[in-house]
Amino acid sequence: MSYHNPYTPPRKSATFDDYTLAEIRRAAATGIYDIRGAGTKRKVPHFDDLLFLGASISRYPLEGYREKCDTSVVLGTRFAKKPIHLKIPITIAGMSFGALSGPAKEALGRGATASGTSTTTGDGGMTDEERGHSQTLVYQYLPSRYGMNPKDLRRADAIEVVVGQGAKPGGGGMLLGQKISDRVANMRNLPKGIDQRSACRHPDWTGPDDLEIKILELREITDWEKPIYVKVGGARPYYDTALAVKAGADVVVLDGMQGGTAATQDVFIENVGMPTLACIRPAVQALQDLGMHRKVQLVVSGGIRSGADVAKALALGADAVAIGTAALVAIGDNDPHWEEEYQKLGTTAGAYDDWHEGKDPAGITTQDPELMKRLDPVAAGRRLANYLKVMTLEAQTIARACGKNHLHNLEPEDLCALTMEAAAMAQVPLAGTSWYPGKGTF
């Protein structure tokens, strides 16, 4: 019989922690890989690892209540006849009808419109409610082509060609059968109740030269009026940004691994892609090397939560940001009000990510008619507008403290890093020094 010293409790493995052991047992019992929504849950270097250097003697701050700080941004100035003018540099990322309920899509449109910004469709096409309540709507053109309608291309204010997504760069999408309702099936030309797997690459091109041809096609369809965005997942941001610019993009959307998804394999979300913080500087460098920084706009997404995150992304060189998961939380996702029902689903408010199952108590990531009734799109849209207002005010507060009268005047020299990793990724000095690792390399 083995003896354990009472003063030395059994020690668990850091490699085989409780979660890892449970996952091994689950996989052994079911033979099925884990599917979930949202973005990575592992801790990665992020905007929290950066701080702003406020003005003191060497800089002149602005008065918060007397001196203005502009927040406007124009997207699509390169080729489009009708670029998009936004009041704030915070947009709503692409999330599909199907993954989200109709009321949720309407709420996103209402909130974005009230805030003077844009929202985006997603895999599966455009709904009339979304178009009707979105003053500025970006139409996603995806590899699956589900729900693609040339008439909707013309009804949109911009087109976003999706090449990749931060939560799963190199992977396609999925919408499980329980969310393929009659309406979703009709829009996507699919059988009701059958799992949908979306392609991971576009069927009519094999490389960047073909992307250029596709962009020209879309310009012809829309009479060169609409800005053309190209969205890529954060994997090789320097080269992907450069190739998107070469192909003729007006705007590059760069999505880091903290960006959410409706459903994919957990192993994909946690092990493929790069943190948002690591993606921005290489993309900006590519634009600068091509003489296109601020001429081709850069929109950054993936884990944007606050006005501080917005300000940091802009300081690193982005023109705007996009939010997805945060917007869903603002309209009611994972609300503790539904805690009892989350527990019945085997989870808790704040951790619910089984969006693919279509059982969301909040009525957001579901197609269940009874659950959808729980979400009031008018009230939810108002909450989103409030959240966007606060984010904007927070970003303005920081910009004024740094002596800037426009959010786009924020720059890397306004930042310092708390960790070596963040300093290397953001290419800003480690706090208390003028040094950062990896200068001149990506």
From Swiss-Prot:
One of its GO terms (biological process) is glutamate biosynthetic process. Residues 108-133 are annotated as: Disordered. InterPro entries: Aldolase_TIM, GltB, GltB_archl_type, Glu_synthdom. CDD domains: GltS_FMN (cd02808). It comes from the Bacteria. Residues 109-121 have a biased composition (Low complexity). Gene3D superfamilies: Aldolase class I. Keywords: Oxidoreductase. The keyword Oxidoreductase applies. GO terms for molecular function: glutamate synthase activity. PANTHER family: ARCHAEAL-TYPE GLUTAMATE SYNTHASE [NADPH] (PTHR43819:SF1). Belongs to the glutamate synthase family. This is Glutamate synthase large subunit-like protein. The gene is glxD.
